[in-house]
């Protein structure tokens, strides 16, 4: 099946966990009295025991009212108490996943009634234990994603093995137009929001604060954990309400995601307005209140039209599909642009780990660009959100600092080690035809920096400069491990976006994992969950980012500390104050 370039963003961000779902869905519930149960105000939750890993799992626990009918596109509403003290919630199977382009497996049902979460704890955990809590926010470009595809069994088991047991929670939230729809009618409505998906996450965190103690978790030791759009969600949550997280979480791990999902728009931006109207027209809404009509439309039809809008964007990133369903600056939850609020210190002051893969852009780079003129047209359509007097100067700096020089493109040079395959800058070494294009490597470098690397640096700059208040320590890394297949070769994309996921979730994908890194990464994360310091249990050097801007190079037998100085001039050109306005940062 040939996918349009833009939809690759969705598939790459979600497919990293597809295979990992299978071990979980094979679990069988213990229907006897020995099945684990937890009493909540909404009923008694009955889970299942997993003797293979020594865990107890509770799947599909509702945390909000179903967002259907008049609640479609609205902020999530909390659940009330159970109607009867005999109410039993069957948590032995996954809940429905949220509406999206395609379900990751036919084993999962997709519906709007998807606001549920999963809890995994060590076997025998009681309310007296008060274990630290790790909360997973999935990625998927804000258009895909679900909790079942991430199997945390080994991670929780690892925590038990090293004597630092944790409770793991995964929150489901709305994506696509159901979670991130804009338009003037949405912005002007008292009953709808452009950031329903972010509000879902926050209500899920409120549920955790009120209920996780019953599962043996400590509500005062909650760490958020996310990758890609999940990491971006966490950054936005740290940034939301002018940096007020209301004590719902206390630390964060953000892998391959920064303060913004590329450009940030407002609900009334012409691109967003166009997407709203095209969605409404696509389901037959042409007059009167389009919002009211959209709420009455069949959910599957809404999703189909939304998916088609994205696909129709073809090879031009973004517009209209790619920017159609993203978090927006709504001036309520997201009160202003990062370039405005961060210098004022409006960021949650909590410990953070934040990092990227070496070649973040290779999964998304444009394969149809044949010349510098093509590249420049693509960047103009991709990056310019607000035309200002600085627009042309900003673009010329981009063209200059991301040159038509293959040696400076991505995949970037990456030296071979005993467990990590090499990536060279020689075009002739690329075995997959699109990767032999100068413009492919150029666009991969630009996209990776524009969407991921520059956003990471923006966040870390705000967190470490201590603008007005920030004092918590932060750590950063770059994942450079290019795992080898049985024949000794690695991915032709280099250490690509999502290549690190199998180091903390189960994902049998036919490649070898470096055993040292496979122990070190989860150990560092568990250490961070317990101590807000990744080195306490790790036994290796990893200094805080700080003024020295130090990164941990994660690379099998060559894990070492490096300086975060690569492509500095180029990324500064993307994020300086004048450029930030042009590019919507």
UniProtKB/Swiss-Prot annotation:
Write the Enzyme Commission number(s) for this entry.
3.1.1.42
> Which compartments does it reside in?
Secreted
Q: List the disulfide bonds.
A: 98-114, 285-293
Sorted alphabetically, the Gene Ontology cellular component annotations on this record are:
extracellular region
How it assembles, according to the record, is: Monomer.
* Active site, renumbered: 228 (acyl-ester intermediate), 360 (charge relay system)
* Species the sequence originates in: Mycosarcoma maydis (Corn smut fungus)
Please list which residues make up the signal peptide. Answer: 1-21
Q: What is this protein called?
A: Chlorogenic acid esterase
Top-level class of the enzyme under EC nomenclature: hydrolase
Record key words, sorted = Disulfide bond, Glycoprotein, Hydrolase, Secreted, Signal
Identify a single GO molecular function assigned to this protein.
Answer: chlorogenate hydrolase activity
Q: Which InterPro entries match?
A: AB_hydrolase_fold, CarbesteraseB, Carboxylesterase_B_AS, Type-B_Carboxylest/Lipase
This chain is glycosylated at 109, 151, 298, 308, 370, 387, 487, 558
Q: Show the PANTHER family listed in the entry.
A: CARBOXYLESTERASE
* The protein's role, per its UniProt record: Extracellular chlorogenic acid esterase that displays a surprisingly broad substrate profile. The enzyme's unique properties may contribute to the specific environmental interaction between the pathogenic fungus and its host, Zea mays. Additionally, the release of caffeic, p-coumaric, and ferulic acids from agroindustrial by-products such as destarched wheat bran (DSWB) and coffee pulp (CP) renders this enzyme an attractive candidate for the generation of natural aroma precursors and antioxidants.
The yes or no answer to whether the keyword Acetylation is present is no
Under the heading Pfam families, the entry gives:
COesterase (PF00135)
Q: How does activity depend on pH?
A: Optimum pH is 7.5.
